[in-house]
């Protein structure tokens, strides 16, 4: 049983916008919330974990940092999440000597309230089903599947896993049908 601190480092925004239309302020928002926030949360947690003899950090990244998706132009979002993925690998090396593991889950399209932050409910109901065919395993992912991946990475069953970015994507990174 895990007997040390665990941080689920989950903060983000999502607002697809073409690269040529992203303002400096919008870009900064992606970096501040997705990357900078996770960087300093991980730093604060790691300091506390060192005092306790170890710990686990599981971050949320995104499939969009692994594979561009033309239907949702998201260069700023993707770049910030690519930073999270790089942070994961770097911290895995830096923190391993302190018995701190860090991993990231990279979900594809998961049906969460985030879509309601830039579309009204009618648009969400119309648009989300169009992504069902995007995943080789079928419909958009349920949040519970991402939660189960996070729970696994935080558990003792994953005690020898660190620095990993785990796609939770219904098979998207394997290829497209």
What kind of feature is each model-predicted range?
Residues 18-19, 26-31, 127, 131:
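Substrate-binding pocket helix/loop in short-chain dehydrogenase/reductase
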Residues 150-151, 162-177:
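Short C-terminal tail/terminal secondary-structure segment
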Residues 47, 93-97, 159:
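Alpha-helical segment proximal to the catalytic Tyr-Lys
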Residues 62:
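Residue(s) in the substrate-gating loop at a strand-loop-helix junction
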Residues 42, 80, 88:
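Active-site helix of classical SDR
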Residues 135-146, 157:
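A conserved structural motif in NAD(P)-dependent oxidoreductases
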Residues 66, 102, 107-117:
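Short, flexible catalytic-loop segment of classical short-chain dehydrogenase/reductase
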């Amino acid at each position: 049983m895990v007997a040390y601190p665990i941080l689920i480092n989950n903060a983000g925004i999502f607002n697809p916008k073409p690269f040529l239309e992203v303002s400096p302020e919008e870009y900064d928002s992606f970096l501040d919330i997705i990357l900078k926030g996770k960087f300093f949360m991980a730093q604060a947690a790691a300091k506390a974990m060192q005092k306790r003899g170890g710990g686990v950090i599981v971050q949320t990244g995104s499939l969009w940092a692994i594979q561009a998706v033309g239907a949702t132009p998201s260069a700023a979002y993707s770049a910030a999440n690519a930073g999270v993925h790089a942070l994961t690998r770097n911290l895995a090396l830096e923190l391993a000597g302190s018995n701190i593991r860090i991993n990231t889950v990279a979900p594809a399209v998961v049906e969460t309230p985030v879509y309601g932050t830039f579309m009204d409910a009618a648009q969400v109901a119309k648009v989300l089903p169009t992504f069902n065919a995007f995943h080789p395993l079928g419909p958009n992912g349920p949040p519970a599947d991402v939660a189960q991946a996070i729970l696994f990475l935080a558990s003792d069953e994953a005690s020898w896993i660190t620095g990993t970015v785990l796609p939770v994507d219904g098979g998207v990174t394997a290829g497209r049908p």
